[in-house]
């Protein structure tokens, strides 16, 4: 039995939730998100409270209800407040520059990397070594940040590469003679 599924979701002021069948739409000041909920889950929207309950006769219904509750909560937080991930570029000559819908990265390769920013994501570069990924969809923000990081993951000897701002890179000692 899922403890997460049992907790109701409170809808903040300024956020509008509509349910049509198994499709839930959340509108807020930052945008609009739509998601189809699993058939094993029954969603009820009453005034400013959303509850997720499992349907009878489905084996993993409680797990699906917990997942649906977490996804709906992420949609509400995203449309109300938004999500952001901060990346740092560590290394000599590593730079980032946001130009319209592309992010130009200089990461020590023989060529610059041009990253196409997906729809629904905004990228800012407060400095040449910092990248801010912002958006409404939590999954898309995290995936975009992971895609940027994948170009040059932090290496364990000098710590050079693209890392999350809160990431601790485990350092290794150099080989001794």
From Swiss-Prot:
It comes from the Bacteria. GO terms for molecular function: rRNA binding; structural constituent of ribosome. Residues 157-171 have a biased composition (Basic and acidic residues). Residues 157-177 are annotated as: Disordered. Keywords: Ribonucleoprotein, Ribosomal protein, RNA-binding, rRNA-binding. InterPro entries: Ribosomal_uL6-like (IPR000702), Ribosomal_uL6-like_a/b-dom_sf (IPR036789), Ribosomal_uL6_a/b-dom (IPR020040), Ribosomal_uL6_bac-type (IPR019906), Ribosomal_uL6_CS (IPR002358). PANTHER family: 60S/50S RIBOSOMAL PROTEIN L6/L9 (PTHR11655), LARGE RIBOSOMAL SUBUNIT PROTEIN UL6M (PTHR11655:SF14). This protein binds to the 23S rRNA, and is important in its secondary structure. It is located near the subunit interface in the base of the L7/L12 stalk, and near the tRNA binding site of the peptidyltransferase center. NCBIfam families: L6_bact (TIGR03654). HAMAP family: Ribosomal_uL6_B (MF_01365_B). This is Large ribosomal subunit protein uL6. The lineage of its organism: Bacteria, Pseudomonadati, Pseudomonadota, Gammaproteobacteria, Alteromonadales.
């Amino acid at each position: 039995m899922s403890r997460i599924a049992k907790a109701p979701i409170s809808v903040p002021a300024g956020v509008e939730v509509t349910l049509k069948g198994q499709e839930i739409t959340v509108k807020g000041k930052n945008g609009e998100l739509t998601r189809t909920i699993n058939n094993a889950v029954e969603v009820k929207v009453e005034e400013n409270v959303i509850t997720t309950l499992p349907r009878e006769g489905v084996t993993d219904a409680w797990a699906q209800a917990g997942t649906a509750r977490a996804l709906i909560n992420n949609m509400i937080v995203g449309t109300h407040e938004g999500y952001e991930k901060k990346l740092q570029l560590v290394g000599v000559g590593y730079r980032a520059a946001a130009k319209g819908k592309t992010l130009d990265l200089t990461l020590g390769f023989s060529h610059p990397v041009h990253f196409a920013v997906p729809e629904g994501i905004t990228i800012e570069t407060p400095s040449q070594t910092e990248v801010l990924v912002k958006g409404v969809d939590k999954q898309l923000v995290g995936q975009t940040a992971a895609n940027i990081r994948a170009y040059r993951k932090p290496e364990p000897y000098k710590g050079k590469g693209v890392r999350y701002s809160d990431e601790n890179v485990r350092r290794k000692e150099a080989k001794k003679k």
